[in-house]
């Protein structure tokens, strides 16, 4: 599959994708499905990627990770990725999708906490 110039290929983990789709509610699942379709066809535009904080204020550790906001440019949802070597060069590995920031009294995990858990095997 040919990825557009200035874009990075995205590789989705089916288990993580299924978990995130089920957890995200109807609106979130629709945003995720639409983004996946676009990213698999075209890739992610490199200039849309934002570097995640290596160490977040919430205790998350996401070194060398990148994020996009959905809907662009500053939606309430986020996708977190990490670059990996792939047989066709560098690619973005999908780590997590979810709400970027919850209200202070919420116990729900943010996309950054989900990505941290998937990288490190535990919550921060």
Regions found by a protein language model. Give the residues of each.
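A short acidic, often aromatic-flanked loop/helix-cap motif at beta-alpha or helix-coil junctions
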Residues: 15-21, 57-59, 102-103
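Arg/Lys-rich, positively charged N-terminal/basic patches that mediate binding to nucleic acids
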Residues: 1-39, 119-124
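Short, well-structured alpha-helical interface segments that form or flank functional binding sites
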Residues: 30, 63, 76-79
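A short, surface-exposed loop/turn module that caps and links secondary-structure elements
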Residues: 40-72
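A residue-level signal for beta-strand positions that form part of recognition/binding surfaces
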Residues: 7-9, 65, 91
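A generic structural signal for short, solvent-exposed coil/turn residues
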Residues: 2-4, 60, 73, 86
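Intrinsically disordered, low-complexity regions enriched in serine, threonine, proline
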Residues: 2, 47-48, 101, 115
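Enriched for short, Lys/Arg-rich terminal
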Residues: 69-124
